[in-house]
Amino acid sequence: YVDSGKGEVLFVVHGICGGYDKIDMMKDKQNDYRIIVPSRFGYLGSEMPSDSSPSNQVNAFIELLDKLNIDKVFLFGTSAGGTIAIKFALEHPERVKGLILYSTAAPFAEKPSSYPKYAGVPKFLTNDYGLWLFRHFFKPMKGMDAQMIHSMLPIKERRAGMINDAAVNNIDMAKNFDDYPIETLKVKTLIAQAKDDKMADYNQIANSVSNFPNCKFLVFETGGYLL
């Protein structure tokens, strides 16, 4: 993990293809905040435990905060990290000052009748060559430019996490719908989402906003994935 800056603690739960190196995305904020970015299970130096569920990932985050003697944080969940950030806020509201969801996975407004068993980067693309070979297709299909693709490399240090996101984290809010009672959330929430985001479904986000008890929804007409 990376722990940098001073001020209010911003605990970043990175998305797919991420890791502690995503601190670079927030380097201009380090003069105002203490930013902590841990690698989630299977990403950049973090092992993959037998229980790789969102709930167990939250347990690992709590252990880290206890080690750092940090009582409460602002949670910043982005992309696939949104599921874990939401789970964290539901299970440990006493440790959360506020929840920020940025171009992220969203809970369902109603329990879905079906869901995919794998929702993420196909396994054959979870390597440097595969990602490089198909790099030009990501912009029109997913809104991810070459610079973003380059920031994901090397894939071999993120592959286990990417597959776990697709097989476990990204489907958990559908598979275990009742474990995400958003209407009981006790923390203030800020959601930022672009309508033209090709990765995080704007309509799903918009439909679920009313379930958040205390939520501000920032909508951008354009900006795409991660604005």
Identify the residue ranges that each predicted region occupies.
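Flexible "cap/lid" loop of the alpha/beta hydrolase fold
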Residues: 99-128
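Short beta-strand/loop motif that positions the catalytic acidic residue
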Residues: 185, 191-193, 197
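Conserved alpha/beta-hydrolase "acid-adjacent" motif
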Residues: 198-204
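Catalytic histidine-centered segment of alpha/beta-hydrolase-like enzymes
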Residues: 199, 217-227
